[in-house]
Amino acid sequence: MAERVLTRVHSLRERVDATLAAHRNEILLFLSRIESHGKGILKPHELLAEFDAIRQDDKNKLNEHAFEELLKSTQEAIVLPPWVALAIRLRPGVWEYIRVNVNALVVEELSVPEYLQFKEELVDGASNGNFVLELDFEPFTASFPKPTLTKSIGNGVEFLNRHLSAKMFHDKESMTPLLEFLRAHHYKGKTMMLNDRIQNSNTLQNVLRKAEEYLIMLPPETPYFEFEHKFQEIGLEKGWGDTAERVLEMVCMLLDLLEAPDSCTLEKFLGRIPMVFNVVILSPHGYFAQENVLGYPDTGGQVVYILDQVPALEREMLKRIKEQGLDIIPRILIVTRLLPDAVGTTCGQRIEKVYGAEHSHILRVPFRTEKGIVRKWISRFEVWPYMETFIEDVAKEISAELQAKPDLIIGNYSEGNLAASLLAHKLGVTQCTIAHALEKTKYPDSDIYWKKFDEKYHFSSQFTADLIAMNHTDFIITSTFQEIAGSKDTVGQYESHMAFTMPGLYRVVHGINVFDPKFNIVSPGADINLYFSYSETEKRLTAFHPEIDELLYSDVENDEHLCVLKDRTKPILFTMARLDRVKNLTGLVEWYAKNPRLRGLVNLVVVGGDRRKESKDLEEQAEMKKMYELIETHNLNGQFRWISSQMNRVRNGELYRYIADTKGAFVQPAFYEAFGLTVVEAMTCGLPTFATNHGGPAEIIVHGKSGFHIDPYHGEQAADLLADFFEKCKKDPSHWETISMGGLKRIEEKYTWQIYSESLLTLAAVYGFWKHVSKLDRLEIRRYLEMFYALKYRKMAEAVPLAAE
């Protein structure tokens, strides 16, 4: 048997050099094609199109050195003749940079700062030799443990538990942080877990053994109060459990950890420690209310997410508190902006109880300036000058409401996460970040060309706020892997913040590490009271059917519905979203309009935008104009129905099921979707679903089994895929049932609020513990962020114009 020889892995530069040496003419021909584009940025599809355009013989020669594979890994090419620089993504979170001189055929490796400096020449012309502010967060996390495998990305808590269980409990001294952690637990002056009788780890172990011996003799259902005083005398307080059985489980788990620690036991033990009683959730922008707001500008999936999240979270908190043997009432406050002029909604009401919850409320605090309260709605892109004063007011309001500090602060979206960072910093509380969507990935090249976008979107403030929040927070929740680190071919939202530049402002050489164990994938679900299968006939809300029939099929055209459906026998192709550029509803209408086969098979119904009132949102105005033009140009009346945004979520659930009755399908055609809550809703109702392959839906749907992926950048192909599906269903009705059932099964396995709530509270416990035992106040990075906030962000925010009243 031949001896196996280990060979050195060649660097990227060496591989390109080898290709150059072997095939100079072919590589020169290709690079000349790239250079001919002139100064600018080429995207992956443009690079591959140029490669496809060269002769097959030349391609074959270059592929001897896997040149096409290298190109497929290239996320952008910067062309500044005679130089072409490539940003090559070897795998998620791992990048290298090179540049090639087309004239001299010389290859250079570039560091991140060198690549970004080269890229800045697109904007600045000659390289700016003056001092440029470089942001580098890597030194602050260099000593923290991190996984290195791609499969570990988004499983931060698992990695952290393995690390903690390996590092701790190996001798008496290593147990001290745990002892201090258990002794630190109290609520409004009441001691929990351990009292002053236990001063060291030896005493703790002895007490636990005594407790174990005593508990074994008791009937499992014995309530805690029957042995409460006995336990107090030996040093144990409330919080271990409500019955002898549960207390014994906790005691045995801790003894097992002290004897032979393992990550699963550690996570289970930490998840049962009483830690979270008061939660503050920040979501300032948009119209945040429970009725009559969905479809308003900046008001969509995030509002639904939080209103579904909170009742489920409260239920899990109540369950855990009961099982811990405590009589504490938890509180959840959703903090948003008070809008005095939002007529017809509760957005002007200071406090509002959350439906489906007993101890959760929406707390509204107004934006203020020196002139007083800001009364009107403000776009999410223009909130930045108000945030600092808003948080000062919020801190006072939540203190008055809770009469205590929150135990966990959860931010949502950019400004909510900045607010959470400021509040957590002020109060010294564990912080959780939920981005929902990071705008930098939605708008290509919005970093390098930020000045073009800033007047309208103020991305300089927003991207800076995102950087501050993601580096300040204790842990980050995402709905999908793609949100963090993309896929084999696409860059993740957080990954896009690893390195970028905004010329004239600053250069980010290390913004975030996607391998950081603060990242955790915790996917939401749909409210099971509103969204359930069309086949559950006994639960169906048939009282809504006359209204839904009117909405879909009436011959009346008005502000609520435009155009009519002439053939009621055809299935309905359905979509529902905000009417903005990224959601791409007009794109779907155009695909449909230009595909005669699809038009012959199905009717198209679009729910989005509000034609009942004049929109203040510029994007919505532009999309409305485009929609009217498509209807007129393609003569869609008769096959198409445009319905204004529907705000009744209960009826919307039945609307999905009503569409399913027609053997229709749901389409989510967005250019990018961070998660895709409507995708989950539609699948939960048994409606076959087609959704964008850019973002979260690519993970929610298993293509061909529980739905279908579509590429919004190739609308013709997407329309053909839809037509193929409906043609197949026409010939074989069981195909529709197969995809419907596949979607329902997928949801049941992965996307429920119960799974979500259990995970979130366990994360809060583990990261709270990690923060304590590692003395992880992260003072150094927080000081760095304070300076960045005060010297850079604040000036940007102040430059955003205040809204006219």
UniProtKB/Swiss-Prot annotation:
Family annotation (Gene3D superfamilies): 1.20.120.1230, 3.10.450.330, Glycogen Phosphorylase B
SUPFAM superfamilies: UDP-Glycosyltransferase/glycogen phosphorylase
GO biological process, one term: sucrose metabolic process
GO molecular function: sucrose synthase activity
Keywords: Glycosyltransferase, Transferase
Enzymatic reactions: an NDP-alpha-D-glucose + D-fructose = a ribonucleoside 5'-diphosphate + sucrose + H(+)
E.C. no: 2.4.1.13
SS bonds (residue pairs): none
Enzyme class: transferase
PANTHER family, A to Z: PTHR45839, SUCROSE SYNTHASE (PTHR45839:SF21)
Protein name, per record: Sucrose synthase
Lineage of origin: Eukaryota, Viridiplantae, Streptophyta, Embryophyta, Tracheophyta
